[in-house]
Amino acid sequence: MNKIFASALMAVAMLGSVSEAEACSNFIVGKKASVDGSVMCSYSADDYGMFQYLCHYPAAKHAKGEMRKIFDWDSNKYHGEIPEAAETYNVIGNINEWQVTIGETTYGGREEMVDSTGIMDYGSLIYVALQRSKTAREAIKVMTTLANTYGYNSGGETFTICDPNEAWIMEMMGKGAGSKGAVWVALRIPDDAICAHANQSRIGKFNMKDKKNVMYAKDVVSFARSKGWFKGKDADFSWKMAYAKPDFSGRRFCDARAWAMLNHFYDMSPYLDWALGKNPDAQDMPLWVVPNKKVSVKDVENVMRDHYESTPLSVADGSDIGGGIWEMPYRPTPLMYKVDGKQYFNERPVSTQQTGFVFVSQMRSWLPREIGGVFWFANDDANMAAFTPVYCSMTERPECYNTPGVDAVHFSKKNAYWVCNMTSNMVYPRYSLMFPTLKEVRDSLDNSYFAAQAGVEKKAQELYAQNPQAAVKYLNGYSVEKAQQMLARWNQLFEFMVVKYNDMIIKPTDKNGTFKKTPYGLGATPVRPGYPEKFAKQLVKQSGDKFLVPEEKK
């Protein structure tokens, strides 16, 4: 989703209005880089006002001549229609029945390359490709063919495209209004490597002779050369330098997130200067690295909860007053603001309040495909929600992820997005005070799903050996049950926290979480925590003697 450019923000501010753009983060793990041989990828869809169900496209057969209407994924604007494929596959969320998974982040790039007359936007490319592809390579072919045939009506995009055996990163841009074409390049991520992208083009130079691991448009270089954007030899061509050269915002708000994600598993300190964005001569960071340990699903979930902890970019250490009294690792937006005519900015971490949904997709080649693909899904900021398991063969959605009559402006306690958001929005301003309670429940749920996974899948395989549909039905029921249990637990959590932290106090509980009472049946005396010491010192430094209690003479 769309990258925030500093120049764009300044231009919009001068016009007197500000529109907050979208932004996302992706993390990718090759099968030899994971603890169990899974290919994994993650995606957080971050956009203010975004409300997203767990989408579902049932498998289907289509008659010759049947057409599919294309609506823009961001705006819901009608673009046109394309012929349906003879057969389409089951899709739940961003994974299909063959375990193919696609995510994205938008970097924008050169505005003149957008084809406003094209039919296919980036979101439509994703979901049409999922319905038509059995492998990542096939998805790349479907997406690029659609863009070239019907036109690409979006800005520059980075796609994560994975299956149980391979992980790919592809970048695409249109060729301008009326072009009905796209330039693109796709690279296979080494099996032993990890990769990340976050709204800044990441592909630089690539080996055009490596036909096994590199795919690209025939005119990927010549098109840039024809526009005067590149003048060197083909071997020296850099995608991002030609089509989306990194600027300060692209590095500090976007590449810094990719830097932080990779930093969980590899020493990225040599590239800190690049992430900080201020030194034009800083060393660019690699597209992928080999991790210093094998990566698990739980690890990837934690990556998506990152706030630059333990790094110079941290927004979680209370080192400035931006986080408020209780050290909230979130900041208000827009990212840029002015004081006395000077431009300032907030950090933009991976975990952010405007997340509509987030997933970690786990794809495994050694299991029957109906069992091998697990789409770990959460309907809010990853830090503030538990990821429930959704199997790729699922054909029935939990009510909490598909609640009738509920959307971005209609609330329901039956809906996961709204229940998670009402809880997280209560916690944000009192983060250090309240978050430990939320985290305890979140981690308990996450760990319970991991603990149950082997047993659930063993039973599913036993059923599969007798009747594959019985296994699918079982996994459907399990996925629905866990999602609905999560919703019930989160509603309980919200009610508990309203009582426990009412009026900025803490009501005492016993080891079982039951509120203590006096011998006479009243609530026990609450604790009044006051200011955290760090904030109290900041307040005194800022206010001087204003609140100093005078010493009284005895």
Region locations from a protein language model:
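Bacterial N-terminal signal peptides that target proteins for export
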Residues: 1-8
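Hydrophobic core
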Residues: 10-17
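Sec/Tat signal peptide C-region and signal peptidase I cleavage site
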Residues: 17-23
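Substrate-recognition/cap regions that form aromatic- and gly/pro-loop-enriched pockets
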Residues: 325-463
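Histidine-centered catalytic/metal-binding microenvironments
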Residues: 443-554
